[in-house]
């Protein structure tokens, strides 16, 4: 089973704005990354997975 970053965020009951703030990036930047226009940095994905207690192995990027 693979999870997208969006699925993880929704599972955490966080808005895009809240997740962007958690990562220390702008909301627009986060939206671009979540929609696939830009790529997430590895450390951003790692931080999201840590917050959600999800293994990096099951994240679909």
Locate the predicted segments by residue.
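DNA major-groove recognition helix of helix-turn-helix/homeodomain DNA-binding modules
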Residues: 41-58
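Key DNA-contacting residues within the recognition helix of helix-turn-helix
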Residues: 6, 31-32, 60
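Short coil turns linking two alpha-helices in DNA-binding domains
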Residues: 15, 26-29, 55
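Acidic-residue sensor for enzyme active/binding pockets
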Residues: 16, 34, 44
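A broad helix-preferring feature
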Residues: 9, 23-25, 40-45
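Short basic helix-loop element that most often maps to the first helix and adjoining turn
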Residues: 3-22
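Short hydrophobic/aromatic patches at helix-to-coil boundaries
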Residues: 2, 58-61
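Recognition helix of helix-turn-helix/homeodomain-like DNA-binding domains
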Residues: 25-39
């Amino acid at each position: 089973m693979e999870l997208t970053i969006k699925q993880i965020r929704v599972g955490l009951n966080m808005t895009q704005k809240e997740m962007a703030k958690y990562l220390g990036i702008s909301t627009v930047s986060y939206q671009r990354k979540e929609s696939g226009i830009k790529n997430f940095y590895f450390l951003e994905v790692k931080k999201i997975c840590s917050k959600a207690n999800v293994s990096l192995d099951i994240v679909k990027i």
